[in-house]
Amino acid sequence: QASIVSSVAKIVASGADYKKVYLTLQEFFEKLRNEPARWGKPFQALLGALEAQLGLNAAAIGGKDSMSGTFLDKDVPPTLISFAIAPVKAEEVISNEFKAAGHPVYMFGSCAVNDYEALKAAWETYHALCQAGKVASAWAVDGGGIAEGVMKMSFGNGVGFRSNPDAGLQYGAAYGQIIAELTEEIEGAELIGWTTADGNITYGSETVSIAELYALNTAVLEKVYPTKTKETDKAIPAFSSAFDTHVAPAVKVAKPKVLIPVFPGTNCEYDSARAVMAAGGEADIVVIRNLTAEDVSRSVETVASKIAESQMIFIPGGFSGGDEPDG
């Protein structure tokens, strides 16, 4: 449930309409063997995902599952990842960093992850504000709660935050809720604070600088994914190249035409076309349509005529759908 709700909330926070969202799921589980407890983990996860999809009217249109995440005595942690997609105009996309001081910050959503009607109502209110141009920034609350969201929204531009003393800020998970920096005050949402220009985050009587929080946050994985290299006193060698320009006659070179047929399940046709063009050829991508018998017949005729015009046929690989043309 939390995975579905979280993914939808993230794309809603970005400015999309939840009613236009589709999902795809990625699952990783240990080898099930003949053990009921192992079978129960993916079964429970998928039942929860289905309940959330029905509650939010969001269909999963594809996905990938793996039930072989075991090597010797090591098991992968039970995992279900939800990806949400929806169309939205580029100019209407909302980013998550606080934009300016003096703006009110509101919370939209329900504390209960499975209160789908309350979530949808809150998301509709929020989306209407997005359409009206009143949302400056937004963050979909995840496992770190509201406190994490406010902290990371402050990192982008160094804009501070002061909490509303009447608001109950959460440090625990609050999947589905959206923190939004608005350009004006409104009714119908919880006011949790205001953006500030002092470079600090203030909760009640506690104040911490954004710089200190950022340093602590980035230091967690610095040893795993270092962002800085070791300093060295060695002089950096200087490289130079001297060459003479000369005029060469224009020589026309024939470019072989390469036919790249795209079957159901084929992928990497664009990579193949780039490789052909980099080698001096002319790529011609032709999609083999098979929705109807007439489509197949026309595709055969098209490919036949294209073959007659080409010097090469390049068949790209495929590992999805029907694994064509070798499936």
Residue ranges and their predicted role:
Residues Q1, A37, P42-Q44, A59-A174, ...:
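Intein/HINT protein-splicing elements and their conserved insertion hotspots or analogous self-processing inserts
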Residues S3-A16, A49, Q53, D115-A128, ...:
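Structured alpha-helical segments in the cores of large, soluble enzyme domains
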Residues Y106, I179-E181, F314-P316:
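Structural motif
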